[in-house]
C-alpha cells in the first residue's frame, strides 16, 4: 500500500510546536471527573466485587476469567491495549500488543503455506470436479467431495496472545478501609480513573494509552498524610522473564515458543518526592506523593509476505535482532519519559479528542446518578426512566466510536480483531482472529459514517496484504495462477490470521467462503465512497477490486439456463451446499458493480469493465422471491420452510447472509418488491439473536426504514447482549456487536447508499426530539440535524469535496436552503420528497422551514383469513386517535372500508384476493399507509410444536442442549420474566403443553 505512516513524525513535530509556542499544559494532578458527563462509564466497586450477568461463553470458564470480560475497562491506542481492574490494594491491568500471535511460520513449520493443502485442492481439479457434479445433479456426491476436498489444514493457525499483567501492590492500603470508591472510563478523554479515600488520604489513579507517544501511562497520586509505598510488577503471560534494569525500569523481552516471534517491552517508573529501586522482577516505590509509569511494547512482526530480497515467502518478520528490537522499544519509552507526564497527556488529549469530538448525539438523554451497571440493570428490568435509557443508548453509540479509535488507528499494523486489541487468554475463543463472514466487516461498519475514516486504513492495508498469499490459495483450490507480476485473482475465506492464512477452514461447513473477499472489499470501496479520495482509490483500492473481479471472471460456471453461478456455494453457517446462492451472488454482483464504477471514475480498463457488467447481468438471481413472498436464501427454495436443514432451523439463525444486498449492499433497495420481500425474510428470521447477530439485525431493519423495529432490537440487545462494562457478548465477548450497534444507530439517522442523503430514515418514536452533529454521508458530506416529534427541523450540510448533493426527506421540496452567506440556493426538484443542488467545496448549506413529517404507518401489519372473514392486525402508533383501513381487489386502487380505535380490524365480507392498507390518525392528521397487506389463509392445525415458524419468540428464549436430554435441542426455554411467545390464530382457544417443573414458570394468555 502506498501510504505514508505519519505517527512518529507527527508526534515529534507537535511536541516541537508546543515547546516554541508556550502552550499551557494541564496541572500535574490526575484527570478530575466531569460532573454531568453523560459519556462516563462509572462503577462503585472494583472488578473483583462486580456482579456477573448473562452467560460467560466459551473460554471464560472461571470466575476470574469471566470478570475480565464483564467488568474491566479497556484503553488502547490502536496497537496496544490494556484492561483496568480498579482494585484497591493490588491494582491490576492486563496488557496486549496486537501483533503478538502464535501460529504462522516457525522452526517447526518450515513448510508453512497458510493452511493450503495441495493434496486436497489439486490446483483446482477438485473444484472443477465438484462443479461438474453439481451441474449433473449429483448433489450428494458433490456435497461429500466438498467436505473432503475443499478444506485446509489447522496446523499453524495460532491465536492472538496476551502479553502480560501489570500489578501495583500497595503496602499501606487495606481494602476494607477504603471509602468513597469510584472507577470510571471517560469516553470524552479516553482516560480511566480509580479513586478512593483511606485514613484521610485521597488516592487517585489515572490510566491512558497515548497513540502519538506509543506508551501506556499510569499516574498514581496520594493527597493527604500518607505517601505511596508500593511494588510494581510486570509478569509475562508467555513465559518470559521480567528483570529490573537499573533502579526504575522493568524489562520483559523474549520469544514465543510456538513460532519464535520476538517481543520486547519496557516499563519505567518515575516518582515525585520519593524513591524507586529495582530488584529481581519488580520495582519498589517509597514515600512518593505521585508516581508516573510509562510502558511500551513491540514484536518483530511485519505484515510482509516476502523477506526484503524476496528469497523467502510467508515471511512476516522485520528481520530485527533481539538487540535492535529492544533498542527500538526502549527509545520509545525514554522519549516519553523525557517529555514528561504533562506533555504526554496533553498530546494524548489533543490527538484523541480531534477524532472523538467530531460527532455528538442528543436523543433526549439525561445524566443519571446511577452507576453504569445499575443503569444497565434498570434498563433491563424496565425501571429506568426514558431519559436514562436514552443515556445508555447514546453512551453505547459513542462507546463504539471510542473502541474504534482505541483499536484501529491510521498507522496500526493490523486491523481490530474479534476482540479489538484486548485479550486475557492464551487460547481465546475463535483465536480472537479475523473472521470475514460478518465479524471483520462489522468491525468497520460505523467507521466512515461516524467520521473516523482514517481508522479504516489498517483494514485496507490488511486486505491488500491478503493478495499475495491469496494467489497461492487461488492456484491450489481454483487453478487460477498469477505468475510474477500478474494479478489474476486471489482467494481468502472465513478465517484469517496475520500470517497469510487464506485457505478454506478445516471444515467446509464453516470454512469455505470465497465470497468473503468481495464482502470485505465493500468495506474498502466505501473508503472512496465516503472520502472521494480518487488518488488513494486508484493506488490502493481499485487494484484489489480489479484482481478479484478478474478472478470471478475465471471461476463462474454456466448452469443449464445459461446463467452464471458460483459453485459450490454455502450460506454462512447453515443449509445445503448448492451451485450458487443468494449470499454469494449478491456479493459478486456488488463486486462487479463497484469494480466497474471504479474503472469508470478512473477512465481505465473499459473493455474489462464491460465484461464485468456483462457477467453481472448474467448472474443467476441474485435476488429471487419465493412462494411465501420472501427473498430466497437458496435458489432451490420454494416456501420459507422448504430448505430447512436437518437439526437446524433457519427461522432463528444468527446469520442474515441473504440480506447482504440490503445491508451493507445496494441491490435490494433498487426495487420496492424486493424491499417488501426482505421484510418477510427478516420477520421469518426472527429477532432471536445476541451479540453481532443483533447488531446486524439493527442495521438491516434500519435500511428498511423501520425505526421502531430497529429500536425494539436495541432494547433486546441491552437486555440480553451487553455486559456491565458495555462490551457486547455473543457470549462470550466479541467486539463486533459493539460496532454493529454504533453503525445501526448511524443508519437510523442517516443513509446514503442509494446515491442521495436520506435524512432521518428510521427515526424511532422514543427519539422524538434530538440532534446529531458530524455524521458523514457518501460524497464526503458532513451532516448536522435537529428534529422535534421525529420531524426534521433543521439540517446543515458541509460539502467537503464539492459536487452535486441530493437530499431525500418527506416534503423536502418545500424547504428553504441557504448557503453560509444567507443566499438562497437554487435546487432542482426531483420529487416532493427529493431535491438536488450543486455545492462548493468547504461551503455549508442550511435547510429550514421543513414540512412536518407525516405520521408513520403502523408497523408489523399482517392479516389472516378463513372463509369470508379476515383479521388485520398491526402495532399501535404513538398518540394515534384511530386507524383508517383501506381495501383493494386489484392491488392498485385502495378505498376506505372502515375505522378502528384498536389495533385489529375484522372484515366479515372478505373475498380472496383482497389486500389491505392501514393508516394512523394523530391530531386529526392521517399518516402514511402501510405497505400492501396480503391476508394468509388460516391453516387448521390440531397440534404444532415449539419449532413452528409461526411462533414468534422474544429475545430471551433459548434451546436446551442435547446434554440435558431435551429432545435434541428442539425444546424452547426461558428464565426471564416477561418473555413472550406469540402465535396468531383464528379459533376459540389455545392449549399449551409443556414440561412440568414444579412451579418454575407459567403462561399468561392475552
What would you call each of these model-derived segments?
Residues 20-33:
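Sec-dependent signal peptide cleavage junction
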Residues 33-508, 528, 549, 585, ...:
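Aromatic-residue-lined binding/catalytic grooves and analogous aromatic/hydrophobic interfacial grooves
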Residues 72-94, 99, 162, 432-455, ...:
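C-terminal capping/lid segments that line or modulate ligand- or cofactor-binding pockets
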Residues 216, 793, 803-805, 868-872, ...:
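Structural beta-strand segments of beta-rich domains
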Residues 853-879, 912, 925-937:
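Pro/Thr/Ser/Gly-rich low-complexity, intrinsically disordered linker/stalk tracts
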Residues 884-911:
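Recognizes extended acidic, P/S/T-rich segments that occur
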Residues 907-925:
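Beta-strand-rich modules
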Residues 935-1006:
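Glycan-recognition surfaces in beta-rich domains, encompassing non-catalytic CBMs
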Amino acid at each position: 500500500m502506498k501510504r505514508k505512516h505519519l505517527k512518529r513524525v507527527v508526534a515529534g513535530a507537535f511536541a516541537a510546536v508546543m515547546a516554541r509556542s508556550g502552550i499551557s499544559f494541564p496541572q500535574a494532578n490526575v484527570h478530575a471527573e466531569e460532573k454531568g458527563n453523560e459519556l462516563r462509564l462509572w462503577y462503585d466497586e472494583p472488578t473483583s466485587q462486580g456482579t456477573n450477568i448473562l452467560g460467560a461463553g466459551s473460554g471464560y470458564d472461571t470466575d476470574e476469567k469471566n470478570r475480565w470480560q464483564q467488568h474491566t475497562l479497556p484503553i488502547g491506542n490502536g496497537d496496544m491495549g490494556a484492561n483496568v481492574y480498579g482494585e484497591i490494594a493490588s491494582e491490576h491491568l492486563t496488557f496486549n500488543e496486537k501483533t503478538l500471535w502464535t501460529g504462522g511460520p516457525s522452526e517447526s513449520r518450515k513448510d508453512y503455506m497458510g493452511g493450503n493443502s495441495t493434496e486436497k485442492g489439486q490446483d483446482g481439479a477438485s473444484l472443477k470436479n465438484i462443479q461438474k457434479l453439481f451441474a449433473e445433479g449429483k448433489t450428494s456426491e458433490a456435497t461429500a467431495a466438498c467436505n473432503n476436498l475443499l478444506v485446509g489444514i489447522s496446523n499453524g493457525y495460532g491465536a492472538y496472545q496476551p502479553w502480560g499483567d501489570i500489578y501495583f501492590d500497595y503496602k499501606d492500603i487495606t481494602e476494607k478501609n477504603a471509602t468513597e470508591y469510584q472507577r470510571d472510563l471517560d469516553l470524552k478523554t479516553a482516560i480511566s480513573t480509580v479513586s478512593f479515600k483511606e485514613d484521610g488520604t485521597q488516592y487517585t489513579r489515572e490510566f491512558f494509552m497515548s497513540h502519538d507517544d506509543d506508551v501506556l501511562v499510569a499516574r498514581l497520586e496520594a493527597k493527604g498524610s500518607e505517601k505511596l509505598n508500593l511494588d510494581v510488577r510486570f509478569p509475562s503471560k508467555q513465559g518470559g522473564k521480567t528483570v529490573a534494569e537499573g533502579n526504575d525500569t522493568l524489562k520483559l523481552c523474549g520469544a514465543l515458543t510456538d513460532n519464535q516471534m520476538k517481543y520486547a517491552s519496557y516499563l519505567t517508573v518515575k516518582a515525585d518526592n520519593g524513591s524507586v529501586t529495582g530488584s529481581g522482577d519488580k520495582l519498589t516505590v517509597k514515600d512518593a506523593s505521585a508516581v508516573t509509569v510509562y510502558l511500551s511494547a513491540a514484536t518483530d512482526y511485519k505484515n510482509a509476505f516476502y523477506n526484503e530480497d524476496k528469497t523467502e515467502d510467508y515471511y512476516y518478520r522485520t528481520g530485527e535482532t533481539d538487540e535492535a528490537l529492544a533498542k527500538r522499544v526502549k527509545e520509545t519509552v525514554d522519549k516519553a519519559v523525557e517529555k514528561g507526564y504533562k506533555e504526554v497527556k496533553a498530546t494524548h488529549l489533543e490527538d484523541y479528542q480531534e477524532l472523538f469530538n467530531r460527532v455528538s448525539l442528543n436523543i433526549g438523554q439525561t445524566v443519571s446518578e446511577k452507576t453504569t451497571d445499575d443503569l444497565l440493570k434498570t434498563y433491563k428490568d424496565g425501571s429506568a426512566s426514558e431519559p436514562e435509557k436514552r443515556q445508555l443508548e447514546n453512551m453505547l453509540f459513542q462507546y463504539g466510536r471510542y473502541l474504534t479509535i482505541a483499536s484501529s488507528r491510521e498507522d496500526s499494523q493490523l486491523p481490530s480483531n474479534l476482540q479489538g486489541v484486548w485479550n486475557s487468554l492464551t487460547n481465546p475463543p475463535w483465536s480472537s482472529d479475523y473472521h470475514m463472514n460478518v465479524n471483520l466487516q462489522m468491525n468497520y461498519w460505523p467507521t466512515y459514517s461516524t467520521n473516523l475514516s482514517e481508522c479504516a486504513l489498517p483494514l485496507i492495508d490488511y486486505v491488500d496484504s491478503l493478495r499475495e498469499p491469496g494467489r497461492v490459495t487461488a492456484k491450489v483450490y481454483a487453478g487460477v495462477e498469477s505468475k510474477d507480476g500478474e494479478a489474476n485473482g486471489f482467494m481468502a475465506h472465513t478465517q484469517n490470521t496475520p500470517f497469510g492464512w487464506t485457505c478454506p477452514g478445516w471444515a467446509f461447513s464453516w470454512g469455505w467462503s470465497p465470497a468473503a473477499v468481495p464482502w470485505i472489499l465493500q468495506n474498502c470501496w466505501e473508503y472512496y465512497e465516503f472520502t472521494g479520495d480518487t488518488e488513494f482509490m486508484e493506488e490502493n483500492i481499485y487494484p484489489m477490486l480489479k484482481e478479484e473481479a478478474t478472478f470471478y471472471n475465471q471461476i463462474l460456471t454456466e448452469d443449464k439456463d445459461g446463467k452464471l453461478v458460483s459453485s459450490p456455494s454455502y450460506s454462512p453457517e447453515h443449509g445445503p451446499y448448492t451451485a450458487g446462492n443468494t449470499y454469494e451472488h449478491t456479493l459478486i454482483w456488488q463486486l462487479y458493480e463497484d469494480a466497474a464504477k471504479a474503472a469508470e471514475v478512473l477512465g481505465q480498463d473499459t473493455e474489462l469493465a464491460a465484461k464485468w457488467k456483462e457477467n453481472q447481468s448474467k448472474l443467476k438471481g441474485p435476488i429471487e422471491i419465493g412462494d411465501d413472498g420472501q427473498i430466497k436464501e437458496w435458489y432451490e427454495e420454494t416456501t420459507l420452510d422448504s430448505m430447512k436443514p436437518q437439526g437446524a432451523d433457519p427461522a432463528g439463525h444468527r446469520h442474515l447472509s441473504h440480506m447482504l444486498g440490503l445491508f451493507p449492499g445496494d441491490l435490494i433497495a433498487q426495487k420496492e418488491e424486493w424491499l417488501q420481500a426482505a421484510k418477510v425474510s427478516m420477520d421469518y428470521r426472527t429477532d432471536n439473536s445476541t451479540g453481532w447477530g443483533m447488531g446486524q439485525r439493527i442495521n438491516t431493519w434500519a435500511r428498511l426504514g423501520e425505526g421502531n423495529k430497529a429500536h425494539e432490537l436495541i432494547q433486546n440487545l441491552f437486555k440480553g447482549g451487553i455486559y456491565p462494562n458495555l462490551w457486547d457478548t455473543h457470549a462470550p465477548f466479541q467486539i463486533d456487536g459493539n460496532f454493529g450497534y454504533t453503525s445501526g444507530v448511524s443508519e437510523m439517522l442517516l443513509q446514503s447508499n442509494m446515491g442521495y442523503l436520506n435524512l432521518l430514515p428510521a427515526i424511532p418514536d422514543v427519539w422524538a426530539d434530538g440532534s446529531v452533529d458530524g455524521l458523514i454521508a457518501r460524497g464526503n458530506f458532513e451532516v448536522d440535524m435537529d428534529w422535534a416529534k421525529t420531524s426534521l427541523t433543521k439540517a446543515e450540510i458541509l460539502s467537503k469535496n464539492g459536487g452535486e448533493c441530493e437530499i431525500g426527506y418527506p416534503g423536502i421540496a418545500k424547504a428553504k436552503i441557504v448557503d453560509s452567506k444567507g443566499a438562497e440556493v437554487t435546487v432542482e426538484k426531483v420529487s416532493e420528497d427529493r431535491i438536488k443542488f450543486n455545492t462548493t467545496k468547504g461551503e455549508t448549506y442550511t435547510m429550514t422551514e421543513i414540512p412536518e413529517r407525516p405520521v408513520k404507518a403502523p408497523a408489523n401489519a399482517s392479516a389472516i383469513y378463513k372463509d369470508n372473514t379476515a383479521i388485520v392486525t398491526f402495532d399501535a402508533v404513538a398518540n394515534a386517535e384511530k386507524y383508517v383501513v383501506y381495501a383493494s381487489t386489484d392491488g392498485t386502487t385502495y378505498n376506505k372500508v372502515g375505522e378502528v380505535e384498536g389495533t385489529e380490524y375484522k372484515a366479515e365480507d372478505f373475498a380472496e384476493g383482497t389486500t389491505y392498507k392501514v393508516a394512523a390518525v394523530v391530531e386529526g392528521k392521517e399518516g402514511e399507509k402501510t405497505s400492501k397487506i396480503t391476508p394468509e389463509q388460516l391453516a387448521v392445525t390440531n397440534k404444532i410444536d415449539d419449532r413452528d415458524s409461526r411462533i414468534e419468540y422474544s429475545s430471551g428464549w433459548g434451546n436446551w442442549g442435547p446434554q440435558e436430554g431435551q429432545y435434541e435441542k428442539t425444546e424452547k426455554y426461558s428464565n426471564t420474566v416477561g418473555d413472550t411467545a406469540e402465535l396468531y390464530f383464528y379459533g376459540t382457544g389455545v392449549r399449551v403443553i409443556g414440561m412440568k417443573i414444579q412451579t418454575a414458570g407459567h403462561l399468561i394468555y392475552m
